[in-house]
Curated annotation (Swiss-Prot):
It comes from the Bacteria. Catalyzes the conversion of N-acetyl-diaminopimelate to diaminopimelate and acetate. This is N-acetyldiaminopimelate deacetylase. It catalyses: N-acetyl-(2S,6S)-2,6-diaminopimelate + H2O = (2S,6S)-2,6-diaminopimelate + acetate. It holds the Pfam family M20_dimer. Its EC number is 3.5.1.47. The keyword Translocase does not apply. GO terms for biological process: diaminopimelate biosynthetic process; lysine biosynthetic process via diaminopimelate. It comes from Streptococcus pneumoniae (strain 70585). GO terms for molecular function: N-acetyldiaminopimelate deacetylase activity.
Length: 376
């Protein structure tokens, strides 16, 4: 039987950035091959650093998918744990070591007997930086194994162990990276009339763009436009010719995201025109679409967990954080949910350390749900 705590600790020590998860993939394949030995209804494929494990059903009517992400973050771990990261500047600070361990535990239980329906376990790379789910889908990695329904979870530090939270609509926002560069004309601070100050134009844009959400988004809906980087100039008495802004757009529906993206671009171009200068606008959403749960499947999952002993189900509001599972759920109906890990530190914090007792709880809950779906 798989030692869940040791497996998690092994994986925690080898975090790798997206599409560089070579040690992680090798570790996972070793475990998977041991679990599947002698199981003639199992097939395994790899895609770059990802892994797909397919359980052929005995009388399949559909394919049920379970997705887990496998990459780490470029963070220096500060937990002080004896099993802390052995990769300098890399850490499993988003709980993907927990995600992988729970998936392996569920795979072990699913292998106890051949399921009626097909089951697909996806170990997906590059959730954090490259939208690995989109890359796999667009590259045809699923082939005829593409699920009819897709499920997945994400750990959440502010929920207690034993709590599961989701809803019947949007769980995560869609996110879009924004880069804007204003190009004016530099000059001496004493002669502003001979220059065209990109810093002033960019500052004007920062204030004007605040109206995009307040005057274009229904107050009942949600959207965010935030610029966290503003770079302009090199010294106090020189008017800069360029100003660079780097920010993010977040929205709870894809239609709203596209509207906000369009308005941000329009405002930037309008400001540039008003100041008679050039502007470059780069919008990069990629595969980070809103994670929109299928209402009927979400209600089924919520009802199932609500009746499970030891589980407290929470109907939760959407989060404005992003998750690339949204891309796969735009192609396949499915559900994502939060799993409580009771950590005082947030996701992506260098001291984030979940409670390990959640591993057994997560495996028991998820595997029972997957067995139910596989038997339908």
């Amino acid at each position: 039987m798989l030692d869940l705590i040791q497996t998690r600790r092994d994986l925690h020590q080898i975090p790798e950035i997206g599409l560089e998860e070579f040690k992680t993939q090798a570790y996972l394949l070793d475990v998977i091959e041991k679990l599947t030995t002698g199981k003639d209804f199992v097939q395994i494929r790899t895609w770059r650093t990802g892994i797909l494990v397919y359980l052929q059903g005995s009388q399949p009517e559909r394919t049920i998918g379970w997705r887990t992400d496998i990459d780490g973050l470029p963070i220096v771990e500060q937990t002080g744990l004896p099993f802390a990261s052995q990769h300098q500047g890399r850490m499993h600070a988003c709980g993907h070591d927990f995600h992988m361990t729970i998936a392996l535990g569920c795979l072990e239980r699913a292998l106890e007997e051949q399921p009626k329906n097909n089951l697909l376990f996806l170990f997906q790379p590059a959730e954090e930086n490259e939208a690995g789910g989109m890359l796999m889908y667009e590259d045809g990695a699923f082939g005829d194994w593409l699920p009819n329904q897709f499920y997945g979870l994400h750990v959440r530090p502010d929920l207690k162990v034993g709590q599961i939270a989701t809803n019947t609509h949007t769980l995560f926002a869609g996110t879009c990276e924004v880069k804007i560069r204003f190009k004016g004309k530099g000059g001496h601070a004493a002669f502003p009339h001979e220059a065209n100050d990109a810093l002033v134009a960019a500052s004007y844009f920062v204030t004007q763009v605040q109206s995009v959400v307040s005057r274009n988004v229904n107050p009942i809906e949600g959207a965010v436009v935030t610029f966290g980087v503003f770079q302009a100039g090199t010294t106090n008495n020189v008017i800069t010719d360029t100003a660079f802004l780097h920010g993010t757009i977040r929205a709870l529906t894809q239609d709203m995201s596209l509207l906000v993206q369009k308005r941000v671009k329009t405002v930037a171009e309008g400001v540039a025109a008003a100041f008679d200068m050039e502007v470059e606008v780069e919008l990069k959403q990629g595969g980070y679409l809103p994670v929109e749960n299928n209402p009927a499947l979400a209600r089924e999952l919520m009802d199932f967990f609500d009746e499970k002993d030891g589980i407290e189900l929470i109907d939760i509001e959407p989060a404005m954080t992003g998750e690339d599972f949204g891309y796969l759920l735009s192609k396949v109906d499915g559900v994502m949910f939060w799993l409580g890990i009771d950590s005082p530190y947030a996701l992506h914090h260098p001291q984030m350390s979940p409670k390990e007792e959640v591993l057994a709880i997560g495996v028991a809950a998820v595997s029972s749900f997957l067995k139910k779906k596989a038997a339908e």
